Swiss-Prot record:
Its EC number is 2.5.1.78. Transmembrane segments: none annotated. The gene is ribH. This is 6,7-dimethyl-8-ribityllumazine synthase. Residues 150-171 are annotated as: Disordered. HAMAP family: Lumazine_synth.
């Protein structure tokens, strides 16, 4: 049996990307952002097609993502942050709530969001992961933007066929 298959597309030319970066644990978040923006550029995304906004912490990321999504100006969004375990339950709360909010915004707005909010046990782990996770976020955003646009066209093709059939019936 032969099946149709979509190949991953990492071509970023013409894509509009919004980035929301937390300022809490700022050195790690800056490292994430630097790696992410560098990778977006490597993938062909123009600097003029990228908007980076910062928020105080990880819990504020979903609201900023929602505002960017509402604008309708982006093909994909990226969430960057670092939640590092402390001595209280707050780590779990921030990790779970920010992650759930990020996922909800993507689903509510039918918009890909690359979640690169690191959740680590300590600073050393966060620093060790920031560069590769920043790059990963850029690749995820570009790939998923291209995938969602390709999948959106599936419905357009069916609509065009139905329109042609309707026109033939009327003729």
């Amino acid at each position: 049996m032969e099946i149709g298959q979509y190949q991953p597309n990492l071509e970023g030319d013409g894509l509009r990307i919004g980035i929301v970066q937390s300022r809490f644990n700022e050195p790690v978040c800056n490292g994430l952002a630097d790696a992410c923006v560098e990778e977006l550029e490597r993938l062909g995304v123009s600097g003029e097609d990228v908007l980076l906004v910062s928020v105080p912490g990880a819990l504020e990321i979903p609201l900023a993502l929602q505002k960017l999504a509402e604008s309708g100006q982006f093909d994909a969004l990226i969430a960057l942050g670092a939640v590092i375990r402390g001595e209280t339950y707050h780590f779990e709360l921030v990790s779970n709530e920010s992650g759930a909010g990020i996922t909800r915004i993507g689903l509510d707005f039918n918009l890909p969001i690359a979640n690169a909010v690191l959740t680590t046990e300590n600073d050393k782990q966060a620093v060790a992961r920031m560069t590769e996770k920043g790059r990963d976020a850029a690749r995820v955003a570009v790939e998923m933007a291209n995938l969602t646009m390709a999948l959106d066209q599936l419905g357009d093709d069916e609509d065009e066929e139905e329109d042609e059939e309707d026109e033939e019936e009327r003729a």
